[in-house]
Amino acid sequence: MMMRDGNISGPKKKKFTTKCRPFSFYKNRHIIMLINDESVYLYNLTLKPPSYYISSIVGQFYKQDNSTKNAQQLVLVSSTTLQLFEINEEAGKLELQSSQNLLGIINSIEKICLSEVDGVVITSDSGNLSILQYDNKTKKFISKIQEPMTKNGWGRNYVGENLAIDPENRCILVAAMEKNKLFYKIESNSSGSKELSSPLEAHSKQVLCLKIVALNTDHNNPLFGALELTPEKKCIINYYELDQGLNHVVKKKPNSSNSDPLPNDVNYLIPLPGHIGGMVVCGTNWCFYDKLDGPRIYLPLPRRNGQTQDSIIVNHVTHVLKKKKFFILLQNALGDLFKLTVDYDFDKEIIKNISITYFDTIPPALSLNIFKNGFLFANVLNNDKLLYQFEKLGDDLTEGELVINSSDYESLNSVRESVTSFKLKGLDNLALIDVLETLSPITDSKIIDSKLVTLSSHSYVKSITHGVPTTTLVESPLPITPTDIFTTKLSLESANDEYLVISSSLSSKTLVLSIGEVVEDVEDSEFVLDQPTIAVQQVGIASVVQIYSNGIKHVRTVNGNKKTTDWFPPAGITITHATTNNQQVLIALSNLSVVYFEIDATDDQLIEYQDRLEIATTITAMAIQENISEKSPFAIIGCSDETIQVVSLQEHNCLEIKSLQALSANSSSLKMLKSSGKETHVHIGMENGVYARIKIDTINGNLSNSRVKYIGSKPVSLSVIKFSNEIEGILAISSAPWISYLYRDSFKITPLLEIDITNGSSFISEDIGGEGIVGIKDNNLIIFSVGKEDSVFDPSQDLTIATTKLRYTPRKMITNGNRLFISESEYNVQGPFKCNINGDVKENVDEDYYEAFGYEWKQNSWASCIQVVDSKSNQVIQSLQLDGNESIVSMSAVSFNKTSTPSVPASHLVVGVCTNQTILPNSYDKSYLYTFKIGKKHLQLVHKTELDHIPQVLENFQDKLLVASGNHIRLYDIGQKQLLKKSTTIIDFSTNINKIIPQTNRIIICDSHKSSIVFAKFDESQNQFVPFADDVMKRQITSIMNLDIDTLIGGDKFGNIFVTRIDEDISKQADDDWTILKTQDGILNSCPYKLQNLIEFHIGDIITSFNLGCLNLAGTESVIYTGLQGTIGLLIPLVSKSEVELLFNLQLYMQQSQNNLVGKDHLKLRSYYNPIKNVIDGDLLERFLEFDISLKIEISRKLNKSVNDIEKKLIDLRNRSAF
């Protein structure tokens, strides 16, 4: 794949294309496919699913094995993904149990009781009402019920907009925003499983349904409360009752005593538990309790002391205690939590009082969930999700704290006139214990040194790196230069490693250290210390063997005394390699012989097998299965002829070669490991830096199903490490250390970050809290653990996120050498910082306070700044706060009278701002261009230029500043006091230019309304841009990038990705025969020539950025895209015809075989707005890896391929550019 940057011109234009023969037909089992050599074929993969979770629910979705407690789990659902988490109470962490791409767009989700466990009810764009249940065997949700409700897609009459389930699981209500409401009764069939009856309709004409909640009726008919809007724009409350006896729906209105008109600022409904019933209706600074046959009870909502912000409830969670007691936590839009309690008279069945108190302040959330074991999960809006633990319930109020009682208020007017305020405080009742890192929303991204740097999560720069963090525990120098390191325990029953053995082949020495509270020399080890050690192993019950160059030292502990036995090779022969486990020892001699020993279980004696194996070539590595209770049936021997041999160690054919496997290079290290009690794999480190994994049949020793990964330029060294009691893996060290392990039937290989070692070994000690790794680098000993400090290793996470806090919502990021220039603007916010663009200003701002409680809200106000971040240290090195009520709308780095290249960064930074800007309706007072000089350390203001238009787009074009606004494009050059206008162009058929890509002598214009994409060339004779080609399809572009000088990839606001290209002949004519081309007349108020559409694909998220690059070592350059909801995806170019044909046909069979959990047709999903074209959906194809073996074989036979061939192709595709 060859690509050229749009800023580079030349005589030859290379295309972003696949190398296929022209117009070939391929026929396989009645499947015909057309491939064109001018087409682009891409393979889509989702690397990180959306992390904007629209809802979260807590329930008992599966029962834990051997657990008497009814543990609860957490379900998080984004627009396309369903994830299940479990709380590890000992570590206080959320652990991911399952993550599924539903291949549909989720609208809402609720919990439903399915006999012994809970399930989830989902409404989606498929038009089905879906009920899913978690299968603990497959660790996935499976479909139980698919009930068609309406047609596919969205609309005002889509009944899945609102979802409510009766608390006693008797019926489900789904309601459209307009008119339609459907009631499904939940019934049990003869087998005891749940099923849905035919729906009962309850249509409400001429009203809009804003919100519906299910009410508790204490075994009476199911009842639902609805907030609706009349044609007169008045809010009303209606009740809908399902009469189970007559099997129809009755619409009821509040009784006459509750018929007071509702204020139009009503926004939220909260149902109360069963013995009380009814609901709390909330509005701006007020709420009241309403019940169908009871009086209303009014209360004001607390407001922050000394601030003018209103208190608007946006979220709540109800928690029921023992003896029918309960409390409700209300959260307003600022994040303040209020505790609502009800004083209920059970004898008279009336409410005596409702009280509200201030509880705590946490970030504003979309949903809150309380676990029975005392945890609170906050599904935070546009930021990391937070897990809290209850320290107390807020009952011990001190004197002076706010308590609001309903008995003090009689009417809604008295409540609305009342102002009750409280004083903010730090967390008192809650304690933060875990953070679930998310990326939503992503507004921009760049690839820097194989890291994806994003502007995300409200106000952060987040650098995403493929790798697992490490924590260094001990680092100390050694008296020798080590070349190898080993750890061992002294007895079989010992849980901890007790000896640390360091070997040096350079100085022919061995150092034995004891492991405990301190690391010190061992004087009585009985080891040979004047020769380098090859292996150390605890064998039998209480023995240790040391294998060194000239023999084997066997140290036995008998009645507390150490006894030694020596074994020596023949004279002049040395030991070159060794591999051991608790019962077996295998060594290789310099005369190419292999000697095998076993341990006598009765007295720990070392018994030599009488025969020896003679190898024809030099042995480079060897391995037997480690850390097992039984004997290893085979040994693996690597030879210098680039092969590995499988040698039997079984009694009937001991030391017999069973099979052989050719490699791409000599093996430098070998390990054999049984993965999670299932398959056994041979792990191979090669001298060319390739790490391979091959499955071995433990019955006959056959090798199959190989997987390879390039991990560095140096020979690969392997060692077995233990991450936890359940997970063992491999430490692979080349140019950098990597770890590989099997987790939930998925094999992961991930680099270790922030550590540099040349050799390592597993290390278990209570003094470091469990499992760790001890390594060597130069003359230093390093002990470290895998995972972040004070946290356990999470095998489900192979991405590390480094964060840098910003002030406001980041909008755009520009790279300049090692610095990032970031523009930030936030609406309806009053910033506490003073303007300092003309120089430093002394100020004392408590940033911790604003981090906890947020900035003060102010209507139609803006807070904006520019921050400079060092991309290496992730530190903010300069902050420039803008003056007054200014908002940043655009920013660009410009080289005035100087060519900008990657080695010569731009000289100036230009920022476009508006004053007093408002949104809906859109307006502004004045607009300016700030010009800053980019210095070696800081930005320095040069001058300020006033404009008569909003600077919507700024770009660098031919050493001038290009400014686009509306349908005008202007060029500016730098002056002494302001920027000087040099050119003006009006694009008649454009309306609102929002993106421009500059090239050498032409630009690519994007319009968010009418003309979509336009190619224009700068005509020096006319001193303006002349458009000559545009897109045939009108799109609302959100992001765009050059693939080559003629090819573009873009995304629109509806979640579609497309690739378009200008015809090669037209592009050449624009360069060579411009005089003729520019005189061509346009067609129907557009350009004379049209672009070719090459790719169409629906992602389901609004694309905010594209980057060319890769996220792994020596990977293929691909397109990496980010979505607003936190999606990170990859588009890999497919480079051969056979590959395209295989994947295309596999996709067809997968579409036929795949059972979608929400009932969405895959072709309709990926063709939401335009038919899918030339993109293979890797998210669908990777489900092949999860199929049972019978279905895999059925599909593979249709494709004339083996199952292993298909699996290997899918894994190799992912490894090309990602992980």
Curated annotation (Swiss-Prot):
GO molecular function: U2 snRNA binding
InterPro entries noted in UniProt: Beta-prop_RSE1/DDB1/CPSF1_1st (IPR018846), Cleavage/polyA-sp_fac_asu_C (IPR004871), RSE1/DDB1/CFT1/CPSF1 (IPR050358), WD40/YVTN_repeat-like_dom_sf (IPR015943)
Keywords: mRNA processing, mRNA splicing, Nucleus, Spliceosome
Coiled coil, from the record: none
An example Gene Ontology biological process: mRNA splicing, via spliceosome
A Pfam match: Beta-prop_RSE1_2nd
Cellular localization per UniProt: Nucleus
The keyword Membrane is annotated on this UniProt entry: no
Domain of life according to the entry: Eukaryota
Keyword hit for Transport: no
A cellular component term, taken from the record's GO annotations: spliceosomal complex
Main location group: nucleus
Function: Involved in pre-mRNA splicing and cell cycle control.
Family: Belongs to the RSE1 family.
Assembly, per entry: Associated with the spliceosome.
UniProt-recorded name of the protein: Pre-mRNA-splicing factor RSE1
Taxonomy of the source species: Eukaryota, Fungi, Dikarya, Ascomycota, Saccharomycotina
Gene behind this protein: RSE1
